[in-house]
Each structure stands twice: as C-alpha cells, then as structure tokens.
Amino acid sequence: MQGNAYNGDCSTLTEVKARMIREDIDVFCLQESGNFFGSISAECWNRIFPEYEFYVARNMQIGTSSRGILVNVYYVAYGKENLRCSMAIIVKSELDTGKAAITYINPNLRPVIGVLLNDNTAVYNIHAPSGNHNFAASVTYCFLQEIQDFKLKYNIDNYVLIGDFNCPPDVMKKNVTYANKTHYADEATQNSGACLDYCIASISPQNMYINKNAAFSDHRQVVMDF
C-alpha cells in the first residue's frame, strides 16, 4: 500500500511496524514510503548495491523483547525532495534469506524491488506510473519479463508482484500475458473508487481483504494470505 509521501517525521514506518505485530503480517510492501532514514539510526543502514540508493537495516526490533519480532527493512531512497518515489519492503527477519533484487526498465521510472523468502518465494514491490492505464500495464509487462528471467536464472520457485499498478485489473488482463495470474479483491482499493492495488503471482492467495481505513494515504491496505 502507499504511505504518506510528505511525511517528514517518519511516523509511517512506526505505524507499519505496529500493524505487522497487530495483524501478524510477514511481508509489508509500501509505496511512497517517505523518509525512513530519520526513524532508524544511520549506522544500521547498509547499502545493498553500490550503483543504487537501495539500503537494508537488519534485525530491527518491533515491540518488546519478550513479545516482539525482528524485521529487515529494505528501502529505496530518493532523498527529501522526491519522497513519492521512495519504496520499502519490511519482512520478518526469520523469513528473509537476505537476498534482494532491484530492477529498472527506465531510469525515469520507479524500480521494482524484491526480497527472497526462505520458502524460495520472491516478493516484489511495484509502483507503476500513473496517468495512463495502458502505459502502466506495458511497464508492468516489462517488469514481469525481468521477474521471469530472475526466476529461471536463480531457480526461484514462486513469485508475487504486489503493489500499486495504477491500472484496473480488467485493463491489465487485456494488455499483459501473465494477467491470468492476477489476484484482486473485487472492491475499491483507493478512495476514488478504483481498484489499483493487487498482485500478479505464480501462486494463488488463500484469502485476501481490504482494510477500508486508508491510514497512510488515499490507498487502502490490501492483505493477502498465501
């Protein structure tokens, strides 16, 4: 789901972590994540790839030491001037292999970032460009081709591409070869009434629901159980 891109005090990460405990969420994908650097000590961040502003902070404590959990926070940073392009994946440390991916199809577009879980499932976070549904679908198709290449190259069993596609599922199905693997709840995920947040995956969710309280932005939290 989307965060508050103009959230300079970094409270978005605090709320995400609280929800992970409250709702027992394993992986949380966030678009427009804002500025995460202010909420985690600078020495905790490690840059994953030298050529990208892609960082990870590992084994961050959520909750109390006796009842809390440890999470790894993956974050693509674009500085304080372009927070709408920042993205994050927060994953329970015990489920994370520590292997991550980032891919661009165009330097002027937001990337897709991904993590590999210990059941050999890769989870990718997407924030497709807005304004034109067909263009958003074509960008998604290009990313899915990259994901298929990753799957074959690294012998990954399954993938889940989830996030804000900026394209309704019916348009996506007309434009994307892999759209038969599109999974969505048949209701609005944005306050405008549009369904833009869902997943395209090689496995099917057993359950999904929409949190109608858009606490972070005008997009609602989409929860899927695999």
Predicted regions and their residues:
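Active-site-proximal beta-strand/loop segments in catalytic clefts of secreted hydrolases
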Residues: 1-4, 30-34, 59, 73-81, ...
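N-terminal, active-site-proximal structural segment of metallo-dependent hydrolase catalytic domains
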Residues: 1-72, 84, 141-142, 160, ...
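Surface-exposed cleft-lining segments at the edges of enzyme active sites
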Residues: 3-5, 99-105, 127-138
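Alpha-helical scaffolding within the catalytic cores
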Residues: 14-15, 101-113, 185-186
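Conserved beta strand-loop-helix elements of the APE1-like EEP
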Residues: 62-69, 81-98, 192-206, 226
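Metal-dependent phosphoester-hydrolase catalytic domains
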Residues: 101, 149-160, 165-226
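Active-site-proximal segments of metal-dependent phosphoesterases and phosphodiesterases across multiple
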Residues: 124-145, 169-172
